[in-house]
């Protein structure tokens, strides 16, 4: 499920940065951190696959469908 992928998927895991806000990553459970970010799941999956800022590109390292599950989990924590 999305939470498991978020916590223990491809390294570095989503949780390794988004739990603490490392390198400016918006934190889960903190809706204010996501202000100004396009919250469209597909747009966030694209950013994850391509890499953005300090976040490395996951294209070729992670399955797009699993990335989408993790993104949807993250979005569910800020609704």
UniProtKB/Swiss-Prot annotation:
PROSITE patterns: CYTC. Binds 1 heme c group covalently per subunit. Disulfide bonds: none annotated. It comes from Halorhodospira halochloris (Ectothiorhodospira halochloris). Residues 1-14 have a biased composition (Polar residues). Keywords: Electron transport, Heme, Iron, Metal-binding, Transport. Heme c binds at residues 14, 17-18, 55. The keyword ATP-binding does not apply. The keyword Transport applies. This is Cytochrome c-551. One of its GO terms (molecular function) is electron transfer activity. Pfam families: Cytochrome_CBB3. It comes from the Bacteria. Residues 1-35 are annotated as: Disordered.
